[in-house]
């Protein structure tokens, strides 16, 4: 007899974006949804009265431990921000810092209804420990940089990434999977990119990388290889169906065609792109071409939070601003990118509420002035709701937040430890 959980008394957001009153019944042993609508009682009940039950949000590009650097350096272009502030600070990270930063970020995401994410960083075992403790779903990888390193260090970094991808591809009973994660097309040499591709195809895991984030990133690739970044990526073997890239801000029509033909996905990070003045990704054009587009926060150092509700609102607004068309990236498209689009990009069977899907749910409390009246639930998700409106968060059938109390962690202790470590890190880095 399976152990069941019923999310009862709310309205349910269906895959076709219709909304109806009903319950969601979850098999906690399997971590799956087993009934929607009129359901039998469960062994345990989560009260969703006055709420909308929606798929858990997917943060498809993140550097979760960078919460320690939230507010550390602002109001700079990407290259200066990285070279003058972030990379020197990261060089001073001590043992345990990344675990502490990751735990803080996981608490923040659970609070905001995120149930799955992709994370590119280093000291991945520390991040995996924190994710395992949190109960979230994730695809993880070691972010490799080989350019500017001597051969021995470059080889070691590359080997670390390959090892991490092998070790964590089915961790935490399958909730945690891996990807090969070369940082970008300009920070990883061509021979290492080709090695990544060969290893990824042999292991049947995707590749995740930054691409076309800034104009400054595009120029050296054109100069060195005589091709656009995604043309170069395709030439070295990237852009397979399961691969996913972050940003894609300066992606041309020809590159969009390459993406559509390949089946590779793009993770749009609107807040980070605005804050670093990187530009606006051509999301409407990508979607019209059939490219899967997901949403990501990027790291908290360049955002400066991990609230995917902010991203879906920004995505909808920027789509209109960029095209001059008010119907570009409509509310439904933005919510889809934050749920089913993210799940598709990361290869998870979540992002929708239907029988057989992963039981990853966010219960959004609509009993608030800014969510009243309710003419259209989806409109409110895109244009009015924030992560603070989430009342319960459920991942893999387990309740991670009930009535706004995060259950896997002592939240006060997590915040205190992260604040202390961030202060010590800043002192070492000479802030």
Curated annotation (Swiss-Prot):
Gene designation per UniProt: mtaD
SUPFAM superfamilies: Composite domain of metallo-dependent hydrolases, Metallo-dependent hydrolases
Binding site for substrate: 90, 183, 213, 298
E.C. numbers: 3.5.4.28, 3.5.4.31
UniProt keyword annotations, A-Z: Hydrolase, Metal-binding, Zinc
The protein's enzyme class: hydrolase
The name this protein goes by in its record: 5-methylthioadenosine/S-adenosylhomocysteine deaminase
Record has Zinc as a keyword: yes
Binding site for Zn(2+): 61, 63, 210, 298
The record's free-text note on cofactor binding: Binds 1 zinc ion per subunit.
Protease listed as a keyword: no
Xref: InterPro entries: Amidohydro-rel, Deaminase_MtaD/DadD, Metal-dep_hydrolase_composite, Metal_Hydrolase, MTA/SAH_deaminase
Family, as annotated: Belongs to the metallo-dependent hydrolases superfamily. MTA/SAH deaminase family.
Gene Ontology MF annotations: 5'-methylthioadenosine deaminase activity; metal ion binding; S-adenosylhomocysteine deaminase activity
Classification of source organism: Archaea, Methanobacteriati, Methanobacteriota, Stenosarchaea group, Halobacteria
Essential cofactor(s): Zn(2+)
Originating organism: Halobacterium salinarum (strain ATCC 700922 / JCM 11081 / NRC-1)
Reaction catalysis annotation: S-adenosyl-L-homocysteine + H2O + H(+) = S-inosyl-L-homocysteine + NH4(+); S-methyl-5'-thioadenosine + H2O + H(+) = S-methyl-5'-thioinosine + NH4(+)
Function: Catalyzes the deamination of 5-methylthioadenosine and S-adenosyl-L-homocysteine into 5-methylthioinosine and S-inosyl-L-homocysteine, respectively. Is also able to deaminate adenosine.
